[in-house]
Amino acid sequence: GSKTAKANVNLSTADFALDHYVAVTTEGQSAGVEQLFAADFNQKIQASNAQNHSRNGVVKLLKKQKGEKLNCTVSTDIIEESADYRIAKVTLKFENFTKTDLVTLERVGNDWKVSKSINSYK
């Protein structure tokens, strides 16, 4: 069998998936990172030099940050949702700046996955 045991993360609802995404991106959680992101996941960073990150790059980075808690206040707003689709705005307030992450979640089979993330800073 494979050496890395699959962490069993419950992604059966959009709420669970979104909570897990926040835990992974802000609290250094690394369990179930692979399951969380859709195969075609893409991350865009809106900045003076806009960047695009593939699924592999983001998964790698998040695994590297395992255990690192960001020093910020997190708030989540649901912008739009349907039975198979949800867009949420995750706001990370740091001392000197705010990061806004627009997250798109989609139902894939029985699980919810993050398919897109657009970050901006102010």
Annotated model-derived regions:
Residues 1, 98-122:
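Short beta-strand edge/turn micro-motifs at domain boundaries
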Residues 1-27, 35:
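Short, low-complexity N-terminal intrinsically disordered segments enriched in polar/charged residues
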Residues 10, 53-97:
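Surface-exposed, charged secondary-structure patches
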Residues 17, 74-75, 101:
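Hydrophobic alpha-helical segments typical of transmembrane helices
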Residues 28-44:
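Short, well-ordered alpha-helical segments enriched in acidic and aromatic residues
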Residues 40-42, 93-95, 120-122:
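Solvent-exposed loop/turn segments at secondary-structure junctions
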Residues 42-51, 67:
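A short gly/proline-enriched turn/hairpin at secondary-structure junctions
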